[in-house]
Regions:
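Outer-membrane beta-barrel and related beta-rich outer-membrane complex signature
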Residues: 16-20, 71-73, 126-128, 174-178, ...
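Beta-barrel outer-membrane channel/assembly domains of diderm bacteria
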Residues: 1-2, 40-59, 136, 153-158, ...
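Outer-membrane beta-barrel "beta-signal"
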Residues: 82-92, 239-241, 248, 264-277
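Outer-membrane beta-barrel architecture
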Residues: 45-47, 84-86, 103, 150-154, ...
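Detector for outer-membrane/organellar transmembrane beta-barrel domains
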Residues: 76, 86, 94-223
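Transmembrane beta-strands of outer-membrane beta-barrel pores
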Residues: 8-12, 63-67, 89, 118-124, ...
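Extracellular loop and loop/strand-boundary signature of outer-membrane beta-barrel proteins
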Residues: 29-32, 68-71, 136-139, 185-191, ...
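Outer membrane beta-barrel
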Residues: 1-69, 73-91, 110-113, 118, ...
Length: 277
């Protein structure tokens, strides 16, 4: 089957960005998502779903404005082009469980989804698909081409769930450009740059009786020459009580943060009650 979407919506990038913020296993998404996701844009998407034996294939193509969310007028650079493929070798998840975290349906057979996407954004003017506009020393919007490659794995079986993601983003250099902090075509007048580099994140959880889940996550993000974020490792452990699935839950987590340019560690604790209608 084929489905055509048009308008502003989430781009077909990493899985954790596509999962609703109300359907997460921990209090918030990972730093890999925060830094490298391709967020939302205005455009046209073609979604396919085909089955070959027990294997489900989902090819997706998107043509978008390339300016990110809520930019209706003007187009500073060019457009963005995205292709994605999802492979579900063991068939569909119950209740679309490949797009919510935690195995709340307690899959009775192993379910796996593998996905990869690539986005080419022509003349990008923001530090990522959303975020700060970059202005050069002449007072003009910067416009450089960005390549973003994303991949993820989702697995669920009898209360156990695993989500792993990888991301890579780079500027496609033009003639005369160099990855230098002094290159005014790549670093804004405010000292900011595109959020380029790579990152990995892996999280797993087990849903015990009474819908209590213990989960853990490891995250690493590494900038190449970017001035917009700091490289770090994060180690998170969390506990959730799902009262009515993701619609009513209590979640808490604690994270040890190791920033590469800081000899000290920091600790972050979070607690939330979430209600959704």
């Amino acid at each position: 089957s084929l489905t055509l979407w048009a308008g502003q919506t989430k781009m077909p990038g990493n899985r954790q960005r596509l999962v609703s913020s109300q359907a997460l296993q921990l209090v918030d998404r990972s730093q890999v998502n925060s830094i490298f996701n391709i967020d939302r844009d205005i455009g046209v998407h073609l979604h396919g779903q085909f089955q070959v034996g027990s294997v489900v294939l989902r090819p997706i193509f998107a043509f978008a404005k390339g300016e990110g969310r809520n930019i209706i007028a003007n187009n500073i650079g060019g457009f963005s082009y995205t292709g994605k493929l999802e492979i579900l070798p063991f068939g569909l998840f119950e209740s679309k469980g490949d797009y919510f975290e935690a195995d709340l349906k307690r899959e009775q057979k192993p379910k796996l989804s593998l996905a990869a996407s690539a986005t080419y954004n022509e003349g990008a003017s923001r530090d990522k698909q959303t975020g700060t506009f970059l202005i050069d020393t002449a007072g003009d919007y910067m416009a450089n081409n960005l390549l973003t490659v994303l991949g993820d794995v989702m697995f669920k079986y009898k209360g156990f769930s695993l989500l792993a993601e990888g991301a890579f983003k780079q500027v496609m250099l033009k003639s005369g450009q160099s990855l230098s902090t002094t290159d005014s075509t790549l670093v804004s007048v405010g000292g900011k740059s595109y959020q380029t580099g790579w990152g990995v994140s892996a999280q797993a959880g087990y849903l015990f009786k009474h819908n209590i889940e213990l989960a853990a996550r490891y995250t690493r993000v590494v900038p190449d020459w970017s001035k917009s974020f700091t490289g770090l490792d994060e180690y998170t452990i969390g506990l959730s009580k799902y009262v009515v699935g993701h619609k009513l839950k209590v979640q808490t987590d604690v994270t040890l943060i190791d920033e590469f340019d800081n000899s000290d560690y920091s600790l972050r604790y979070r607690l939330q009650v979430e209600v959704a209608f």
